[in-house]
From Swiss-Prot:
Annotated organism of origin: Ictalurus punctatus
Segments for region (Disordered): 93-131
Comp. bias intervals (Basic residues): 101-121
GO function terms (MF aspect): structural constituent of ribosome
One GO CC term, this protein: small-subunit processome
HAMAP family referenced in this protein's UniProt entry, alphabetically: Ribosomal_eS24
Protein name: Small ribosomal subunit protein eS24
Keywords (A to Z) from UniProt: Cytoplasm, Nucleus, Ribonucleoprotein, Ribosomal protein
Length: 131
């Protein structure tokens, strides 16, 4: 990352309950294209003396005219806390979660089996379909 790119944190908060530091992040990049999230993660990890795998950045919007991008960042104390608290789609972006995909036919068969029963019995029919 170039020296012309600056990271500024706003609204910094240490969230002890979720074992993370969360902040609004301003990326100043005058005359440059939007900075990739991987580079932002690496620079934040260096700032907070941790590894890039526990840094999650998201929700970036570039200001009209460029030069400034604003988003959110979370730095977890450990990878276990990150896996427990981050949504699955964000973990998948980092390569930490793989969704198991059932075939279309299996999904349809399960749906049709569940249509035949009512109420709380649906859970047992749905669980039987997951085997």
């Amino acid at each position: 990352m170039n020296d012309s790119v600056t990271l500024r944190t706003r609204k910094f908060m240490t969230n002890r309950l979720l074992q993370r530091k969360q902040m609004v992040l301003d990326v100043l990049h005058p005359g440059k294209a939007t900075v990739p999230k991987t580079e932002i993660r690496e620079k934040l990890a260096k700032m907070y003396k941790t590894t890039p795998d526990v840094v999650f950045v998201f929700g970036f919007k570039t200001q009209f005219g460029g030069g400034k991008t604003t988003g959110f960042a979370m730095v977890y104390d450990s990878l276990d806390y990150a896996k427990k608290n981050e949504p699955k789609y964000r973990l998948a972006r980092h390569g930490l979660y793989e969704k198991k995909k059932t075939s279309r036919k299996q999904r349809k068969e399960r749906k049709n089996r569940m249509k035949k029963v009512r109420g709380t019995k649906k859970a047992s029919v749905g669980a039987a379909g997951k085997k």
